[in-house]
Swiss-Prot record:
Family listed: Belongs to the MAK10 family.
Biased composition (Basic residues): 558-571
Region (Disordered): 548-573
Keyword annotations from UniProtKB, A to Z: Cytoplasm
Oligomeric form and interacting partners: Component of the N-terminal acetyltransferase C (NatC) complex.
Protein name as catalogued: N-alpha-acetyltransferase 35, NatC auxiliary subunit
């Protein structure tokens, strides 16, 4: 039966879900079942009435509403106790504000830490940290340890929120910055709070020392327990102070503050084992007070902020368990320590690689934000000291050695040439800062943003080529032996290709591609993007060598002494080698997929509303804004990858064999790399088993089986280990 209600001044909020409560309210119920059914008869079979006010947001809300996992409002219908706020709980005597015992302090602090972590993982403050009544108004608290801790947590939340907002690398699924009008302890200074925490810490340390066992003395179990509990409170208070001091250090502009943060993180890490071992000393939540909700702890009320939540209830916040708390903090500390290392880098390319590698770990929103604000400080200088323009010039020098940036070149002091290069470098700042900021977003959002930034880099590419041409014609008049062709253009093209490659590869990590799409993704990478990347790197290497030769000749002319020639390690050689390995891995996967398709092992969808061409064009749509390299359209791809142009056309066994050779080649390249890193070892873990599997398939193993193979992406995100089922 469908009912329509006219509700007059009803204040029962989410309690309307209970039928007995509906009966008590001043509601005049009207049966509209008949009217509704008659209205529905006007619609044809399968037809839906879509009101313009009923958009996607309302549709999602309708799906989520009253689902206990998605709708936080559902908990309210299952609770029979009276929900009290902080002041009411104090009057009622259900909460202690003075003389808290050590087990009570430990239990409350641990639950607070769990709420803090849950907030950092994307839930709202109202459903997490502010379910702790002590945090609502620390002025009411008389217990010094609890008061200092509550203020410390508020300050940590406030500074973390400020950092995340400033870095602007979060989306709605990452972080919720709303404070719901709660006071964030703004009336108390950061210094005062750290001082209060230090006082409690010192007091606890005295108690720890006074209860410590003395040599030759028989130990009283009660004194030993008190010693353990005091040590547990001391560790938690000190951890709170250290974490707060670290966040304060990151707000300072001096680079020395980063070293200070690194030191403090080591102190925080040392406290974790004591916190982990003493979790058992804290009071536990009471289980019998509620149904369907997490158990209630003294000082906590999960439903206290229910009316502050938006009308479409947010998802139910599952507070993490205490056992997971220490593990999370341990990883957070490691991430913050890694963030501190970025200030040791001087080259823009190394910084970009650092951001890429850091992002691959899928770090939390706080550590991502700290990395962003450490890199580009308020004064818009890198690490607060270097101009971004200077970083771009250094990157150009180390990559292509353009003559215009060489002090020994005639263009170096030419005003017009200076204007050209300065204007170009200034135009580079925004796209490169945006690119670094993109690497601060979560992995799924990054991919979307990489597709958009290609437009900016395409414009930059066009400008680079024009500046190159202008500088080249100027240089020819004065130094005909030197060239300025494709110097700046090569550098921008290199970054363009890196973005395109990253865009395609991230689709494997995010599991966006179906198995039948793998072949054209790997083809585009191996035959096109990696081929372009290697020629770009080779061109940059040649440009460097040409500039070095000119410099050497100039040196020879000045000095009559013979210099011993040392074999110099080429700066780009490792990257060229890695690109060759990646190209071989992609080529191996492409040929594997074509062979599987020939053997009928690839399940293809029955295309009705789309086709392979539509999917292909959708996958490579962002590349249409790029002029160099020109995008490969579907018909062009089909023509280029057509096997019938070979005489005789290769069979599946030939392709499996060719694929095994590609994997073998990748293995050889990688095994010759000195000091292999994790990435090299990860690719080897894929290449080696794939060589064996391809050889088996080439020999006719399971040829008649139509069961699709399995692709295991666990050893490497972009290249799977092929498994025969």
């Amino acid at each position: 039966m469908v009912m329509k209600a006219s509700v007059e001044d009803d204040d029962s909020g989410w309690e309307l879900g209970m039928p007995d409560k509906m009966e008590k309210s001043n509601t005049d119920w009207v049966d509209i079942t008949q009217d509704f059914e008659e209205a529905c008869r006007e619609l044809k079979l399968g037809e839906l009435l879509h009101d313009k006010l009923f958009g996607l947001f309302e549709a999602m809300s309708a799906i989520e509403m009253m689902d206990p996992k998605m709708d936080a409002g559902m908990i309210g219908n299952q609770v029979n106790r009276k929900v009290l706020n902080f002041e009411q709980a104090i009057k009622d005597g259900t909460i202690k504000i003075k003389d808290l015992t050590s087990p009570e302090l430990i239990g409350i602090m641990d639950t607070c830490f769990c709420c803090l972590i849950t907030w950092l993982e994307g839930h709202s403050l109202a459903q997490t940290v502010f379910t702790c009544l002590y945090i609502h108004n620390p002025d009411f608290i008389e217990d010094p340890a609890m008061k200092a801790f509550a203020l410390g947590i508020l300050k940590i939340c406030d500074i973390a929120r400020e950092k995340v907002n400033k870095a602007a690398v979060f989306e709605e699924e990452d972080f919720q910055s709303m404070t719901y009008g709660f006071k964030m302890a703004n009336s108390v200074t950061d210094l005062r709070v750290t001082g209060m925490l230090k006082d409690v810490e010192d007091d606890m340390q005295r108690r720890v020392k006074s209860t410590r066992s003395r040599q030759g003395e028989e130990r009283d179990p009660e004194v030993e327990l008190e010693h353990q509990q005091c040590l547990a409170v001391f560790s938690r208070v000190k951890f709170t102070r250290v974490l707060l001091t670290v966040l304060i250090a990151f707000t300072k502009k001096e680079t020395s503050a980063v070293a200070e943060a690194q030191e403090l993180m080591t102190q925080a890490a040392d406290l974790l084992s004591a916190i982990h071992n003493s979790c058992i000393h804290g009071i536990q939540a009471q289980n019998d007070t509620t149904k369907g909700d997490h158990p209630i702890m003294m000082g906590f009320e999960p439903l206290v902020n229910q009316r502050l939540l938006p009308p479409t209830f947010p998802r139910y916040a599952k507070i993490i368990k205490r056992e997971e708390m220490v593990n999370y903090f341990s990883k957070l500390i490691d991430r913050i320590k890694t963030v501190c290392e970025v200030v040791n880098l001087t080259n823009l390319h190394c910084i970009l690689d650092f951001f890429c590698e850091f992002s691959e770990q899928s770090p939390c929103v706080l550590s991502r934000s700290l990395l962003q604000t450490t890199f580009l400080v308020d004064n818009k200088k890198v690490f607060g000291t270097h101009l971004m323009q200077d970083m771009v010039k250094d990157a150009l020098r180390s990559f292509v050695s353009p003559p215009v940036l060489s002090p020994k070149c005639c263009l170096y002091n030419n005003h017009q040439a200076k204007d050209y290069i300065d204007s170009f470098v200034t135009h580079c700042v925004r796209p490169f800062c945006s690119l670094i900021q993109i690497h601060g977003h979560n992995r799924a959002r990054q991919r979307d943003k990489l597709g958009h930034i290609l437009e900016e880099f395409a414009t930059l590419q066009d400008e680079a080529e024009k500046v190159d041409a202008a500088l080249h014609s100027m240089l020819l008049k004065q130094e005909p032996q030197r060239q300025h062709l494709a110097c700046l253009g090569t550098w921008v093209l290199y970054h363009n290709l890196r973005i395109m490659i990253q865009y395609l590869l991230s689709g494997f990590e995010l599991e966006l591609y179906s198995m039948h799409e793998y072949y054209y993704i790997y083809w585009y990478l191996s035959e096109f993007l990696y081929a372009w990347l290697m020629s770009t790197l080779s061109r940059a290497d040649s440009s460097q060598m040409a500039e070095e030769r000119i410099m050497e000749e100039q040196q020879k002319g000045r000095s009559s002494k013979k210099t011993k020639k040392k074999k110099k390690v080429r700066p780009l050689s490792r990257e060229i080698t890695m690109s060759q390995a990646y190209q071989n891995m992609c080529a191996g996967m492409y040929k594997t997929m074509i062979a599987f398709d020939m053997d009928g092992k690839v399940r293809k969808p029955k295309f009705e509303l789309d086709s392979e061409q539509v999917r292909y064009e959708h996958r490579f749509a962002p590349f249409n804004s790029v002029i160099t390299p020109p995008p490969v359209h579907y018909l062009q791809f089909k023509e280029m990858s057509d096997l019938n142009k070979y005489s005789p056309p290769p069979q599946s066994a030939d392709l499996y064999m060719a694929a095994s050779k590609h994997f073998q080649q990748a293995k050889m390249i990688l095994e010759n790399i000195p000091n292999p890193d994790h990435e090299v070892n990860r690719i080897l873990k894929v290449a080696k088993p794939n060589i064996v599997v391809m050889k088996l398939l080439a020999g006719g193993h399971k040829k008649d089986s139509k069961v699709p193979p399995e692709f295991d992406f666990s050893p490497h995100k972009y290249f799977p280990v092929v498994k025969l089922v």
